[in-house]
């Protein structure tokens, strides 16, 4: 994967906050100046060698440049402590990525779109709502709200877990998050939780996902199966009306059997904007990243971006 990425899109950097972010820019094969571009914001713990390159390549094939990047503290970007998922800093990184694209000589600053998946979906909604220059937004199974937007009932049913075991597991995770926050205040080494693993010790615990995460570790050399536990104390919350403030058209692509993100909650949010489109696909949260379902979703997203960014009469 690393060699293929280097061939498709050489490594570059852009400044962000107190450091920089590593990134790769996928260009259409018939690259020219004044290209539209989509900035891809990966999900929880995600690095730019996992999930996002596949979507970026499809968008480049459709004539749209695509920027993938590593948030600070993850992957090839600097930042200590490592494996820190900080919502505020990640949104700062996303804004820095947009600024980089607007300055790039090959890209059209008036045709910058955002794409976000899972946690990245929350980032792109918040950033686009405050930036009227964003031309289009794609939200792929967006984790907009860690409480109201979580599909708790479906997750309980899938795990065969009652509310009491869930409460005990949640308390263990909360204790880890609080301890990690205390350690962070004293610049001590983080208390890590696994991204995928056993209940009470990891964020994702569904045994059906084991093969997905084994494949991630094998195919994405910079991804790590751990995150600083303090993330739980700042997981995203959606403020009603945010989507209604967004000037850009937005496409929501959802999985109808998603036990992580509530499709019903996302449909309610989408109703805030008359420029929203919602499409649902069979499968779970991670199914839309793989196989035939991925091809269908990526094709629909590329068609939406082409319709908005390559509209007749616009320069290409």
Label each region the model flagged.
Residues 44-57, 71:
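The serine-hydrolase catalytic nucleophile loop
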Residues 84-104:
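Alpha/beta-hydrolase active-site loop
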Residues 246-247, 252-254:
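Short beta-strand/loop motif that positions the catalytic acidic residue
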Residues 259-265:
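Conserved alpha/beta-hydrolase "acid-adjacent" motif
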Residues 1-32:
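N-terminal cap/lid segment of alpha/beta-hydrolase-fold proteins
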Residues 284-298:
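Catalytic histidine-centered segment of alpha/beta-hydrolase-like enzymes
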Residues 58-78:
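Conserved alpha/beta-hydrolase
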Residues 126-212:
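Alpha/beta-hydrolase-fold enzymes
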């Amino acid at each position: 994967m690393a060699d293929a990425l280097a061939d498709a899109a050489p490594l570059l950097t852009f400044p962000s906050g107190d450091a920089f972010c590593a990134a790769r820019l996928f260009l259409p094969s018939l690259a020219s100046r004044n290209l539209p571009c989509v900035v891809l914001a990966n999900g929880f713990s995600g690095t730019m060698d996992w999930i996002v390159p596949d979507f970026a390549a499809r968008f480049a094939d459709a004539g749209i440049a695509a920027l993938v990047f590593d948030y600070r503290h993850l992957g090839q970007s600097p930042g200590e402590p490592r494996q820190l998922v900080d919502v505020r800093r990640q949104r700062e990184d996303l804004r820095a990525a947009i600024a980089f694209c607007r300055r790039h000589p090959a890209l059209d600053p008036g045709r910058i779109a955002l794409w976000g998946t899972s946690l990245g979906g929350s980032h792109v909604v918040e950033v686009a709502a405050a930036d009227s220059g964003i031309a289009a937004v794609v939200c792929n199974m967006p984790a907009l709200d860690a409480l109201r937007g979580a599909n708790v009932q479906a997750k309980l049913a899938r795990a065969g877990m009652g509310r009491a075991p869930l409460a005990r597991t949640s308390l263990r995770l909360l204790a880890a998050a609080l301890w990690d926050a205390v350690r962070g205040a004293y610049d001590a080494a983080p208390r890590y939780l696994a991204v995928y693993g056993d209940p009470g010790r990891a964020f994702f615990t569904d045994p059906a996902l084991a093969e997905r995460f084994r494949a991630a570790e094998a195919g994405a050399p910079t991804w790590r199966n751990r995150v600083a536990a303090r993330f739980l104390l700042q997981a995203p919350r959606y403020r009603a009306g945010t989507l209604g403030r967004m000037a850009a058209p937005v496409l929501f692509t959802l999985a109808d059997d998603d036990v992580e993100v509530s499709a019903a909650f996302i449909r309610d949010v989408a109703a805030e904007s008359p420029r929203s489109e919602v499409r649902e696909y069979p499968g779970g949260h991670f199914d839309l990243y793989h196989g035939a379902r991925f091809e269908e979703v990526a094709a629909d997203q590329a068609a939406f971006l082409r319709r908005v960014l390559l509209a007749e009469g616009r320069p290409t």
